[in-house]
Regions:
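Amphipathic alpha-helical coiled-coil scaffold segments and their short linker/junction regions
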Residues: 57, 63, 72-74, 94, ...
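Short, acidic/charged, Gly/Pro-enriched secondary-structure junctions
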Residues: 79-97, 106-110, 292
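Sec/SRP-type N-terminal targeting helices
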Residues: 80, 96, 134-162, 212, ...
Length: 351
């Protein structure tokens, strides 16, 4: 770096700051797709319809509410999705920092001694620097915007994970509730078949029926027993599915006793909803955001071939005495032009 007179260095610094204000628009964290007017936005959907994210609460079931609360607190997939959101936000903040000037500073002290003459000397120095890459082609902005889109996509991923978890827990609850009632009916039916089998055998013993009646009664009884056994096996499977969704250890209990699950009254569903609201599904929105992120990444990669200009300024001092280190500052400025297209053999493999 060459040392320049104070006025020239100050002028370079002023130009750098002025260009930074013009050439570095911030990445917009509120980028949306509703500007096209082709889909109904989330805000419009919420305004026109009664959108309740905790829809299961309309059933007013303490067991179902307790299960949902436990699932949302314990589920591993939901926690991993939250971590992904934080990582994407962290990366977006890092890339956004490239749009503003970066500062650096240092303090140094050096001591030396001549072993032959015994003389020694001390040197003290300090430096304050500023560096800024002009975003002339909006390469940095495109890179930052791509990460903002990715951050929004991870938000939708978490919303989709939450929605999937809620639906799976609700399915497991209603499956268990159905199986509980089906098993109760199957047990009552089994008792009836047992009584029919007893009567058929008694008739056969007293000669009031041929051998086919006890045989048919036994077959019906075995069929009822098999049906009951199948329902019980399905119930055990659904209970294990629910435990997995709740992320429970073998020693932990569910927030509600599955034996108490019962089918709930059917609630009315508003069917007068336009199909355009499907565009607000979290998985679809995540896919749309990632398409936008890919487009911005392509733009940034194309613009990486263009020349880049980096401006720098520094304020440095040096003295052989600590108390006079800051007495005689020297101001310097620099401008660096990078020509990446000259390294085309490497750049072409990155596209």
């Amino acid at each position: 770096m060459k040392t320049k007179p104070f006025s020239q260095a100050a002028l370079s610094l002023a130009i750098a700051l002025a260009l930074s204000a013009c050439a570095a628009p911030k990445a917009n964290p509120n980028l949306t797709l509703e500007a096209t007017g082709q889909v109904m936005s989330t805000a419009e959907t919420a305004e026109r319809y009664d959108v309740n994210g905790n829809w299961w609460e309309i059933y007013q079931s303490p067991q179902l509410n307790a299960l949902m609360e436990q699932a949302l607190a314990n589920n591993v997939d939901l926690k991993q999705a939250a971590i992904s959101v934080n990582k994407a936000l962290y990366q977006a903040n890092i890339l956004g920092a490239d749009l503003v000037p970066s500062f650096s500073g240092s303090l140094g002290a050096n001591a030396s001694k001549n072993l032959k003459t015994g003389s020694h000397g001390n040197t003290f120095s300090s430096q304050l620097g500023l560096s800024y890459e002009l975003d002339l082609w909006r390469k940095l902005s495109a890179t930052a915007d791509a990460q903002v889109w990715e951050y929004q996509a991870t938000h939708e991923d978490m919303a989709n994970t939450r929605l999937t978890l809620i639906n799976n827990v609700a399915d497991a609850y209603f499956n268990i509730a159905y199986l509980n009632e089906a098993i109760e009916l199957a047990q009552k039916s089994l008792k009836q078949y047992q009584e029919i089998n007893r009567i058929a055998n008694a008739k056969f013993r007293y000669g009031r029926a041929d051998s086919s009646q006890p045989t048919q009664a036994k077959q019906s009884l075995l069929s009822a027993e098999n049906s009951l056994l199948s329902l019980q096996n399905n119930l055990d499977t659904q209970k294990q599915v629910l435990r997995n969704l709740l992320n429970l250890r073998p020693s932990e209990n569910m927030a509600a006793d599955p034996a108490q699950f019962r089918l709930l009254p059917v609630k009315g569903v508003n069917l007068d909803v336009p199909i355009t609201v499907l565009a607000n599904r979290p998985d679809l929105r995540a896919a749309e955001y990632r398409l936008q992120a890919s487009q911005q990444s392509v733009n940034a990669q194309k613009r990486s071939w263009y020349p880049s200009i980096t401006l720098g300024a520094s304020l440095s001092t040096s003295s052989d005495k600590a108390k006079s280190t800051f007495n005689i500052p020297m101001l310097g400025g620099s401008a660096t032009i990078n020509l990446p297209f000259l390294n085309w053999q490497t750049m072409k493999w990155k596209d």
